[in-house]
C-alpha cells in the first residue's frame, strides 16, 4: 500500500485504488491506578491519571477526528469510534459528538480536576493531569496522531506527552503504564474478546491496559457461546454498550479511537481490481483476496 503522505501523488501512468478498512488507530488507556504492581516481565502496571474516567472521557471529547484524518492521513481515512466500525458486531450508537470542549471541561471539574494558574494544568490533589502518549518511533503516522491529539487536548489542562520508543522498550517499560497509540482491526470479532476480556489483561499487546469489567466479560463469553451469528452479534454489541455499561465511549471509555485508515494502492490503468472488500489491520495483503476477479482491460 502507498503511505498516506504519498497517496496524493500517483505516477501519471498509474491509477489510485482506495480500499476501505477497519485498520484503526486509537489510544489505549491504562485502566488501573499505579499501586506499584508489575507484570510478569517486570513492566510497571497502572497510571493514576488515565485510571480516572473523567480524563478518558475528556480526551475522547477533545479529539477532532476529521482533522486527524486530514492531517495525519492526508485525507485518506475516516473517523474511528470503536474497534470494528461498520462491521456487524459493532455498536453503531457509539459515535461521539466531538470536539466538545465545554462538556469535557464540565466533566473534569465535576470529577475534582481543578485548573492551576501557574502552569495551566489541571490537578486532582497533588496529581497533575499529565501522562505519556507513547507510539512506536518507526511509525510516522502514529507520531503525527500523537502530536496532533496532544495539542487538541492541551486546552483542557491535560498534558499528553508524545513519546516515541522502540517496540522492545515499549514492552519493557511503557506497555501497561503509558497511554499507547495502537492499531487493530479484524474481520473476526474474536479480536474484541482479546482486547476487552479480563482474562487477557496484560496478555501481549491486546488488553495491555488491564481493562476489567465483569458485565463486559459476561457479554463476551455469551457471544462466544451463542448458537448463531445473529445472537452472537447482539452480545458483541452489548459488550461495547448494553445500556448500563460497556467498554465503549458510553461506558468505561477504555480507548480513545481516532481514525480508520484507507488502504491506497497504485496500479496500472489497465488493471481492474473488481469489487474490493473491507481491509483489516495492515498485516497481510488483503487486496489480493479477490484475485480471481482481477481483469486486464487493455488490448
Task: State each model region's role.
Residues 4, 51-53, 99-100:
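Aromatic- and glycine-enriched glycan-recognition loops and surfaces
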Residues 42-60, 123-130, 251-255, 285-290:
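Glycine-rich, flexible loop segments associated with nucleotide phosphate handling
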Residues 17-25, 60-96, 100-105, 141-151, ...:
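Detector for C-terminal structural segments
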Residues 1, 88, 113-186, 263:
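Ligand/substrate-recognition segments at binding pockets and active sites
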Residues 2-11, 186-191:
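A ligand-binding cleft/hinge motif common to bilobed small-molecule-binding domains
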Residues 23-55, 71, 260-262:
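A bilobed periplasmic-binding-protein/Venus flytrap-type ligand-binding module shared by bacterial periplasmic
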